[in-house]
UniProtKB/Swiss-Prot annotation:
Keywords in alphabetical order: Membrane, Transmembrane, Transmembrane helix
Highest taxon of the lineage: Eukaryota
Pfam family, one: TMEM215
Membrane-topology descriptor: Multi-pass membrane protein
Region Disordered, annotated ranges: 99-145
One BP term from GO: sprouting angiogenesis
Name under which the protein is recorded: Transmembrane protein 215
Family annotation (InterPro entries): TMEM215
Transmembrane as UniProt keyword: yes
Length: 235
């Protein structure tokens, strides 16, 4: 690239069409004075010679010396069938609409079966991730009723799913308002007072406790509105 930011190929195009530009300009000026070439006025010949040269220079600058396709020009050409790129079949499967997911056509079980991952638990890392159960304790509402985030059927299904990926002993499961840890694990579990102060009502808490870690512990709270139990979600 030249210091003046002009492609050498563009400069070559300008040099080649400069002859047409000069003669086109001369014929245009002469035609404005009323001169003719036989029965043909020069005012009609000048622009016919000059305009193709200007178009060639503009095209050379857009394509950087005819080396690449214009970025934002001739968009209608890209819409032709010959320019369309076929989408990957796996990408189309993953980009299903929410209606297909709700109908079960693109469920997580189906995708896992296609990927060959069904029944194979993921490798456990050194820092085990503790998944806390939802708060099942009654939460009084304005009407004086009690509500729970997860129904019994969904909760049992979720528990079986978590047991398959997190075997017993590899994770700590507890309620945010009730400590259910044994004596040996009590040092790793937070106190009920801390959870009551920070955990929103009727929410899900996902905490990570890694032994001998300089980052201590951290928790992630999921709002009730954002919770979706119809499909698995990896946090």
């Amino acid at each position: 690239m030249r210091p003046d930011d002009i492609n050498p190929r563009t400069g070559l195009v300008v040099a080649l069409v400069s002859v047409f530009l000069v003669f086109g300009f001369m014929f245009t000026v002469s035609g404005m004075k009323g001169e003719t070439l036989g029965n043909i006025p020069l005012l009609a010949i000048g622009p016919a010679i000059c305009l193709p040269g200007i178009a060639a220079i503009a095209l050379a600058r857009k394509t950087e010396g005819c080396t690449k396709w214009p970025e934002n020009e001739l968009l209608w050409v890209r819409k032709l069938p010959c320019f369309r790129k076929p989408k990957d079949k796996e990408v189309v499967e993953l980009l299903r609409t929410p209606s297909d997911l709700e109908s079960g056509k693109g469920s997580s079980d189906e995708l896992a079966k296609k990927a060959g991952l069904r029944g194979k638990p993921p490798p456990q890392s050194q820092g085990e991730v503790s998944v806390a159960s939802s708060i099942n304790s009654p939460t009084p509402t304005e009407e004086g009723e009690c509500q729970s985030l997860v129904q019994n059927g969904h909760q049992e299904e979720t528990s079986r799913y978590l047991d398959g990926y997190c075997p017993s002993g590899s994770s700590l499961t507890y309620s945010a308002l009730d400590v259910k840890c044994s004596a040996r694990d009590r040092s790793e579990c937070p106190e009920p007072e801390d959870s009551i102060f920070f955990v929103p009502q009727d929410s899900i808490i996902v905490c990570s406790y890694k032994q001998n870690s300089p980052y201590d512990r951290y928790c992630c709270y999921i709002n009730q509105i954002q919770g979706r139990w119809d499909h698995e979600t990896i946090v």
